[in-house]
Amino acid sequence: CIRDREKSDALGAMDKFYNDAYSLISSKEAREAFDMSKETDKMKERYGQNQAGQRMLLSRRLVESGVRFVSMTYGGWDMHQNIEAGFNKQGPELDQAFATLISDLDERGLLDSTLVMMSSEFGRTPKINKDNGRDHYPRVFSVAMAGGGIARGQVYGSSDAFATAPEENPLLSLIHI
């Protein structure tokens, strides 16, 4: 029956996908990429001895080992209360780690072939709320991109003076429409 064959083809493709994925993560190269003891203390300090730094260092190691797509998270940005204290802790950590990732990839000759993107799922309200935080705001937010052959030092688009709406070259996604 054709339906049985379609199911069989789909299951076979799924099996192949899972086997390929397992082969990738269980390979010698992957094990070595995840072995952070191979990095010098100086390099670990350069990225930062915190979640942002060590995750971005691991991301570089994965790219270096040939992984074609790396996604990392650095949570704790949902600051509905006391945004100043939260941002004063996380902002410098993220800034150090991201800047180091970009310069490290560039120094290793990997930046032009690696597109690095940093984004959030939405922006934050332009005004501080009653709890000294900011709430979800999908109308305006930023994405930072580097490498992958894109021009350096460019800014695309802008918001109005109060960051309440896109002003120049707005980009939309179906998620936010």
Predicted regions and their residues:
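Ligand-binding pockets and gating/stacking loops
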Residues: 3-175
